Swiss-Prot record:
Part of the 30S ribosomal subunit. GO terms for biological process: translation. GO terms for cellular component: ribonucleoprotein complex; ribosome. Disulfide bonds: none annotated. GO terms for molecular function: structural constituent of ribosome; tRNA binding. Keywords: Ribonucleoprotein, Ribosomal protein. The gene is rpsJ. Belongs to the universal ribosomal protein uS10 family. SMART domains: Ribosomal_S10. It comes from Acidiphilium cryptum (strain JF-5). Pfam families: Ribosomal_S10. This is Small ribosomal subunit protein uS10. Involved in the binding of tRNA to the ribosomes.
Length: 102
């Protein structure tokens, strides 16, 4: 696996769970001898929904809800076979979407 990079993108609604998962990945990669670049915080995607407060009248009375999707980016430079094995066995928290590109 010479001169290859592993790019890991993480997404979650809760930034604390996301940061803990990122920390676990970084610690695992460093423990196996790989060099880690990041975590790089990517822009938070905010999706807003506007609904009427009343089901019948009062169009001017509305309520807004939002979902925030937090994202992080990690690059693992020159991973060893032990790094890949350790990352495959890593058990991350529920609610974190992991996307890996080699």
């Amino acid at each position: 696996m010479d001169s290859q990079n592993i790019r890991i993108r993480l997404k979650a609604y809760d930034h604390r769970v996301l940061d803990n998962s990122t920390r676990e990945i970084v610690n695992t990669a460093k423990r196996t001898g790989a060099q880690v670049r990041g975590p790089i915080p990517l822009p938070t995607h905010i999706e807003r929904f506007t609904v009427n407060r009343s089901p019948h009248v009062d169009k001017k009375s509305r309520e807004q809800f939002e979902i925030r999707t937090h994202r992080r980016l990690l690059d693992i430079v020159e991973p060893t076979p032990q790094t890949v094995d350790a990352l495959m066995k890593l058990d991350l928290a529920a609610g974190v979407d992991v996307e890996i590109k080699i």
